[in-house]
From Swiss-Prot:
Compartment(s) where it occurs, according to its Swiss-Prot or TrEMBL record: Cytoplasm
Name of protein: Alkyl hydroperoxide reductase C
Species, as recorded: Ferdinandcohnia aciditolerans (strain JCM 32973 / CCTCC AB 2017280 / YN-1)
Segments forming domain Thioredoxin: 1-138
Subunit and interaction comment: Homodimer; disulfide-linked, upon oxidation. 5 homodimers assemble to form a ring-like decamer.
Main subcellular location: cytoplasm
One Pfam family recorded for the sequence: AhpC-TSA
Any GO molecular function: NADH-dependent peroxiredoxin activity
């Protein structure tokens, strides 16, 4: 089914927007499958997932219908042939016309809380994404606390203050 998605679609809920270069390629299906494997965990966190490339929605449908790997995907695949969304998120490679490999965590206010851009040949790990979302949600729900490196749900956080300066 085809749906219309706008920047308003990212408001009122946590969202992940995952740009990838192109359908029918090599690294992209491995990433999108990995994201699908974590989709239930993301939904439990109240997160909606959107993937996007500069392909058309017809190309997405063809890929979805012809690939066993991509056929498993149940989250939205955005077609951005006008390159507007890719350009707005500053992931458009103006030379190739393709989106860079970019991931954005967007809070319910529509504010980007985390952004990651990978080189074309480097795939992403969705389990790391799940942990970043948990950290972003924790910080939002616990003002005055921050999550240190390698933080996992249940770990101690930090409360920045003058007393903490130079003691970490």
């Amino acid at each position: 089914e085809f749906i219309e998605v706008s920047e308003e679609s990212f408001k009122g809920q946590w969202s992940v927007l995952c740009f990838y270069p192109a359908d029918f390629t090599f690294v992209c299906p491995t990433e999108l499958e990995d994201l699908q494997n974590e989709y239930a965990a993301l939904k439990e966190l109240g997160v909606e997932v959107f993937s996007a490339s500069t392909d058309t929605h017809f190309t997405h449908k063809g890929w979805h219908d012809s690939s066993e790997t991509i056929g498993k995907i149940t989250y939205a695949m955005i077609g951005d042939p006008s390159q507007t969304l890719s350009r707005n998120f500053d992931v458009l490679n103006e030379v190739s016309g393709l989106a860079d490999r970019g991931t954005f965590i967007i809070d319910p206010d529509g504010v980007v809380q985390a952004a990651e851009i990978n080189a074309e040949g480097i795939g992403r790990d969705a389990s790391t994404l799940v942990n970043k979302i948990k950290a972003a949600q924790y910080v939002r729900n616990n003002p005055g606390e921050v999550c240190p490196a390698k933080w996992q749900e249940g770990d101690e956080t930090l409360k920045p203050s003058l007393d903490l300066v130079g003691k970490i």
